[in-house]
UniProtKB/Swiss-Prot annotation:
Organism field: Gallus gallus
This protein's name: Ashwin
InterPro entries: Ashwin
Pfam families from the UniProt entry: Ashwin
Coiled coil regions, renumbered to chain: none
Principal cellular location given in the protein's record: nucleus
Compositional bias (Basic and acidic residues): 11-21
Stretches for region Disordered: 1-21, 82-102, 212-241
UniProt family annotation: Belongs to the ashwin family.
Length: 241
């Protein structure tokens, strides 16, 4: 039994030594063959030009740049080190599964190919039989009658009347109102003219008071707007009853 136990221990040590030797070989690509280097580069999705025959030196340079494993710190043989080794072993298959699922999801989606013609396409507009575009079509005939228009009404009345509902009687009333307004304005203007030509005469028994404005001595001090002009030489005095 003791011999079998020793044999098992010896076999385990040999396996560990072989695993370490393989990992050490990955850190020294000069010892690897060209075929192995090509396989590792293809697994890492690193393109190698088929036209150009690369030497082993070129493959080793690519391997060192992209595919060489990163250095990792050796864990101590304590309880914490054993726990970290277990976590690493558990995380390795998870990361592989995630990468596989991501690649599968990308493959399920259809590939989008952009052609040169798609960027330089011109905008197409549908044309009618007459050659005019749909945007420039006139409005339908039914909408013209229903439009809202503002009529020339007196200043007091600020209402909107639709052209369709307006009758002839309403039009006549509007015209009569305009004529009345014109007559009122004419009478007001005639009254003002009469007042200017015939000023009010003073009533008997009342005193006439003349209002005088104080004019400065120097006319140069006055502004241009307040200076007397030739047309306004006579000042009309106001008479109070």
């Amino acid at each position: 039994m003791a011999a079998q136990g020793r044999g098992r221990v010896g076999g385990g040590k040999e396996e560990r030594v072989s695993a370490r030797s393989d990992s050490e070989l990955l850190l020294h690509p000069e010892l690897l063959s060209e075929e192995f280097l090509l396989l590792t580069l293809e697994q890492k999705n690193i393109l190698v030009k088929n036209d150009v025959k690369m030497d082993k030196d070129g493959l080793t340079d690519l391997y060192i740049q992209h595919a060489i494993p990163l250095p990792q710190r050796d864990l101590p043989k304590s309880r914490w080190g054993k726990m970290m080794e277990k976590k690493r072993k558990q995380n390795e298959p998870k990361s592989e599964n995630k990468s596989v699922t991501a690649v599968g999801g990308l493959r399920k989606r259809p590939l989008i190919v952009f052609d040169g013609s798609s960027t330089s396409t011109s905008i197409k507009v549908k044309k009618t039989e007459n050659g005019a575009t749909d945007r420039l079509k006139p409005p339908p005939a039914g909408s013209i009658t229903n439009t809202v228009r503002r009529l020339s009404a007196p200043s007091n009345a600020s209402t909107y009347i639709s052209a369709s509902s307006l009758s002839e009687d309403a039009k006549l009333e509007v015209r009569n109102n305009e004529a009345k307004q014109n007559n009122i304005s004419k009478t007001n203007s005639s009254v003002l003219v009469n007042l200017k030509t015939h000023p009010l005469s003073p009533v008997a028994g009342t005193t006439v008071v003349k209002l005088k404005r104080s004019v400065p001595k120097d006319e140069s001090d006055l502004p241009n707007d307040l200076k007397p002009t030739e047309a306004k030489k006579k000042i009309q005095h106001c008479t109070w009853p």
